[in-house]
């Protein structure tokens, strides 16, 4: 924060769990290129003033506004699903325990890469020495702001699972807080880096993380 700062913080405050009132919140969004967003939150007080449950889910879909002329399909779209729950237990005025669990599934297209292969680079050299197709070079490319021509689909298959447990104990003089978290990440991403209809440089990489 302030002058010459190279970093900062983003504080995301979620909707709190209600211990007193049942309720629901639903929002729908639709737009061009197959845009469809659905967000839902449901509040369920299980024991009045003591135990409550919040359920949530969201879905984002978008076909993408860039046309791949080689594959004859729209690319650059989104396909994300998020769901989970938060439970809050407050047996006394000075103690509460919250358990949060959620899953994020992301099968979005990993971008729409344009052909930037200059003369002297391998994808362009293949074209110059007679290999097909004839537009491996940027100078021969037909792509633009809403059109690409890579031969591969930049797909993803990612799943993120998170658990957070928070306990607060207030002694009037001090507030003691314990936070436990666990996150599992399973990722697969395919990216066609050459951006041309030349079957040359693509990466299909996998990550499996736990923290």
Predicted regions and their residues:
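Outer-membrane beta-barrel translocator/receptor signature
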Residues: 2-69, 73-83, 94-95, 161, ...
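Outer-membrane beta-barrel domain signature, strongest for Gram-negative TonB-dependent receptors
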Residues: 72, 78-211
């Amino acid at each position: 924060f302030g002058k010459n700062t190279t970093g900062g913080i983003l504080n995301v405050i979620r909707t709190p769990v209600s211990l007193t009132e049942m309720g629901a919140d639903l929002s729908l969004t639709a737009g061009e290129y197959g845009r469809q967003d659905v967000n839902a939150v449901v509040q369920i007080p299980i024991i009045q003033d003591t135990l409550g449950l919040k359920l949530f889910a969201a879905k984002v879909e978008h076909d993408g506004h860039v046309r791949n002329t080689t594959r004859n399909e729209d690319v650059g779209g989104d396909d994300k699903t998020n769901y989970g729950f938060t439970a809050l237990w407050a047996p006394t005025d000075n103690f509460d325990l919250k358990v949060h669990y959620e899953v994020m599934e992301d099968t979005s297209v990993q971008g729409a890469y344009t052909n930037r292969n200059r003369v002297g680079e391998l994808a362009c050299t293949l074209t110059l020495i007679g290999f097909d197709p004839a537009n491996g070079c940027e100078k021969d490319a037909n792509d633009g702001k809403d059109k690409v021509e890579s031969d591969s689909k930049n797909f993803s298959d990612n799943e993120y699972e998170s658990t957070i447990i928070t306990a607060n104990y207030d002694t009037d003089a001090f507030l003691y807080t314990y936070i436990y978290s666990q996150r599992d990440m399973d990722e697969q991403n395919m990216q066609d880096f050459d951006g041309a209809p030349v079957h040359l440089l693509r990466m299909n990489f996998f990550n499996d993380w736990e923290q």
